[in-house]
């Protein structure tokens, strides 16, 4: 199992150009990672943004196969080793239809550069903005917070680049519509088993979108 820190988060580097904090860049990064690991079977489990990356990988894989099919090559050569293929896909709390209001709310949360004097205060703040995550035990909230906050300068700050919010805040309605069309095309191109997971109170993946999927 490989669980990477996407660019700008955790132990991964921050990008000098915040405009690159977007799904196309993440898909490119993950395709490179997959090429390095090259698993015999690729099962992608994606929550929220991770699911969008999975859909992006699926779309990229389809384009690669189409391009290869149209490109003649000499007989007898082995299949190319860069044949990216998803064997299974889990989409948790995400789908091809984007909720602009929710994404703007997420951008606002990401942009807030809050610092807390104690870890307990950081956990309390995280619980307040994460109520739609559902019920968790105190121990589970603490464990989640340890992946989100890091001790820095005598306080606790979130372990990611605040500039992650820049591309989200700059999006316009037309861009969202174009993005949705691409995501639906990627979803329709899937030729592997797909598991869709939706929480009862999710506002990122609506019941209507889940039903359409």
Language-model-derived ranges and their functions:
Residues 2-45, 59-60, 64-82:
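Active-site loop/oxyanion-hole signature of alpha/beta-hydrolase fold enzymes
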Residues 6, 91-94, 201:
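Active-site loop/turn elements of alpha/beta-hydrolase fold enzymes
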Residues 9-12, 97, 204:
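Active-site loop signature of alpha/beta-hydrolase-fold enzymes
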Residues 12-18, 101-102, 207-208:
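Conserved catalytic-core motifs of eukaryotic protein kinase domains, centered on the activation segment
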Residues 46, 50, 54:
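Gly/Ala-rich beta-loop-alpha elbow adjacent to hydrolase catalytic centers
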Residues 78-121:
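Flexible "cap/lid" loop of the alpha/beta hydrolase fold
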Residues 107-112, 121-135, 146-149, 172-175:
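Helix-loop "lid/cap" segments that line or gate small-molecule binding pockets
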Residues 149-213:
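Conserved serine/cysteine hydrolase catalytic core
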């Amino acid at each position: 199992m490989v669980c990477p820190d996407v660019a700008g988060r955790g132990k991964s580097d921050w990008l000098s150009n915040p405009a690159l904090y977007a799904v196309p860049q993440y898909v490119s990064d993950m395709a490179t990672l997959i090429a390095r690991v090259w698993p015999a079977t690729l099962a992608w489990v994606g929550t929220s943004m991770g699911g969008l990356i999975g859909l992006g990988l699926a779309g990229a894989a389809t384009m690669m196969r189409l391009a290869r099919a149209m490109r003649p090559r000499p007989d007898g050569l082995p299949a190319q080793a860069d044949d990216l293929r998803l064997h299974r896909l889990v989409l948790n709390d995400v789908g091809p239809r984007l909720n602009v209001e929710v994404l703007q709310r997420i951008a606002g949360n990401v942009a807030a550069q809050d610092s807390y004097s104690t870890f307990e205060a950081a956990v309390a703040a995280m619980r307040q903005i994460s109520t739609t995550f559902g019920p968790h035990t105190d121990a589970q909230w603490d464990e989640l917070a340890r992946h989100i906050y890091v001790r820095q300068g005598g306080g606790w700050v979130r372990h990611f680049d605040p500039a992650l919010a820049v591309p989200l805040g700059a999006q316009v309605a037309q861009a969202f519509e174009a993005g949705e069309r691409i995501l639906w095309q990627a979803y329709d191109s899937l030729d592997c088993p797909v598991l869709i997971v939706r929480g009862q109170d999710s506002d990122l993946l609506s019941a209507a979108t889940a039903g359409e999927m």
